Amino acid sequence: MDTPKSKKIELIIPAYRMHTQSFLNVLDGISEEDALKRIDGKTNHIVWMAGNFLNMRYDLGMVLGLKDEDPYNDLFFQGKALDESYNYPSLDELEKNFHDISPKVFQKLLEVTDEELDEIFEIGMGVPFIRETKLNFAGMCLGREDYLCGQIGLMRRILDYPGMKYDVDENIKY
């Protein structure tokens, strides 16, 4: 069991690890061709969803002090709208970056202190009941990851793939 320095982050740790598993499972078997398909020109494609998921990991890492930058930040930062004129990375490229940044962010989650998590991190939401702290940002990142995995799961079914499996690879420690 991973023991974080912060009691406040204890809820985030298992969710983060499960999201790692879910992300890999929901993308399992999706072809590169299908990953770029949109439904009636109305949906984002799976590559965009996966890229935005990955961008959340980079953003969380940045908030926790990592210097790593998302090589595709220009395509995905803050849920930037899909633009079919852009050349998006392949799922393989995104997965490689996912395996690079995710363990680093996980380590930062284990090391962060309560004091650091209480620091203000303004993102300009302007929602009166949300205190913009690093802890709340971490929670919102996980919420976004949930949402994106659900969207990819729905796209799997629409594109005639089987539903996502909930297998766990115990060798992945992040």
Q: How would you label these PLM feature ranges?
A:
Residues 1-17:
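Extreme N-terminal tail/first-helix region
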Residues 5-8, 42, 87, 94, ...:
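Residue-level recognition of alpha-helical structural elements
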Residues 14-21, 111-116:
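An acidic intrinsically disordered interaction segment
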Residues 16, 20, 27, 98, ...:
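Hydrophobic alpha-helical core bundles mediating ligand binding, dimerization, or RNAP-core interactions
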Residues 29, 52-55, 100:
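Residues within well-ordered alpha-helical secondary structure of globular protein domains
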Residues 29-36, 108-120, 157-162:
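Surface-exposed helix-capping loop/turn segments at secondary-structure junctions
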Residues 82-121, 136-145:
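Acidic/histidine-rich alpha-helical segments that form the ligand environment
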